[in-house]
Amino acid sequence: MDHQTAEALRAFTQRYCAVWQQQRHSLPRSEELYGVPSPCVVDTQGEAVFWQPQPFSLAQNISAVERALDIVVQQPLHSYYTTQFAGDMSGRFAGETLTLLQTWSEEDFQRVQENLIGHLVVQKRLKLSPTLFIATLESELDVISVCNLSGEVVKETLGTAKRITLSPSLAGFLNHLEPVL
């Protein structure tokens, strides 16, 4: 496990939960995750869940992605997807507002790996260098990803070679990410 990435993700999650406490006097709340089972759910009110992060309970790797495409995934990405179960979290980095994607449950972890495989298959078909997404943006055409060759965090336009480097490392990106509600 890449401890720098795991620690940076836990630290961002703590900052995110603290902003919820300061501004809304509650745990993080999600309507999108209402009715979806997870060890993160603390309470349900109306059609929303209140959640807190929980330790990841499965093998700490995304080896299914590696096996499917016969590649080696950068260690920080293994750590990112297997440090915790949590709801998606909003943040801002270099003026970009984004939604940091998280794994909600054991079942969700399977879906996340399938989506990563699909993303990599499309890139391979288009002869693009491999990236694994970690966040979404307002524009559905753009995502925040980690380049599997360099380890850099990039803003990429899906289906194209257009990439803008945001950070030299995933841990550095997470350490500079500002939580927003």
Curated annotation (Swiss-Prot):
Places the protein is found: Cell inner membrane
Protein name: Protein Syd
Domain of life according to the entry: Bacteria
Family: Belongs to the Syd family.
Main location: membrane
Keyword Heme: no
Annotated GO CC locations: cytoplasmic side of plasma membrane
Organism: Klebsiella pneumoniae subsp. pneumoniae (strain ATCC 700721 / MGH 78578)
Membrane topology: Peripheral membrane protein
Record's keyword terms, sorted: Cell inner membrane, Cell membrane, Membrane
Keyword hit for Cell membrane: yes
Protein's job: Interacts with the SecY protein in vivo. May bind preferentially to an uncomplexed state of SecY, thus functioning either as a chelating agent for excess SecY in the cell or as a regulatory factor that negatively controls the translocase function.
Pfam families: Syd
